[in-house]
Amino acid sequence: MAGSTLSSYEVDQKEYYNRITEEYDLHYAIKSALKYRYGIYHKIFSNINLKTMHILDAMCGGGESTGYFFRHGALVTGLDISENCCAIYRKRYPECSVVCSSILDTQFAGSSFDIVMTDSLHHLHPYVNQGMDEIRRILKPGGYFCCWEPISHSLADLLRKFLYRMDARYFLENEGSIDIKRLVQTQAHHFQMVDCVYGGNLAYLFVNLSMALRIPVRIVKFYSPLFIVAESFLDRFQPKFLSCWALCLLRKKEIFETF
């Protein structure tokens, strides 16, 4: 394990994901869940030439995000705190390197990556700012940080909090939605906003979150094509407060602003 001594939150997270690795991968790595994920990423990355870019898939799990970048010719490195997740990643993407480490202290050299991608900032509470400091350090000047996160102050956030109280099996105590507006404001000296897309309804809940909702994978495969199309249509009219997630793309400033 790279990096310094883990906090109690990180130890709990490592043990948790080591325990549920197989079940997590069964749900999040199925074809329908990946199709949904890749379609979302394409909303932001379609205008960026990813070929030969060095990308860190931070808190990568079994590499659910890596596939999108790998198929576009990027050089991808995975990072996860769970040894079991790293083992799956290594088997799935033998062409890529993977590091078993906390994102809070990666031991990568500064300015190592063109892009850092994560869908797991919400696992970092109360260390989100510390995590962003490390992400900024390892990003090249002008590099991109992209996060796909459940958002706070939304109807979906209320549902998440209800599920947390009712079912502790698939949720950790420190998990919480991300306040995107606050994140952007606190990072304004270091990053500029490039784009932010909001969305998520039927497919996000019943395809992407099938594990949390205890929906068998065989059933997800049956209805997922319809739900993905339906969500794409509903997203056109859905107000932000009804959205489940935000996909936010920030760019590291070439010169740090001190004012």
Would you name each region that the model predicts?
Residues 129-141:
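A short glycine-rich, Lys/Arg-flanked "PGG" loop and its adjoining helix->strand segment in the class I
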Residues 174-191:
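Short alpha-helix
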Residues 1-50, 52-61, 68, 146-169:
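Conserved class I S-adenosyl-L-methionine
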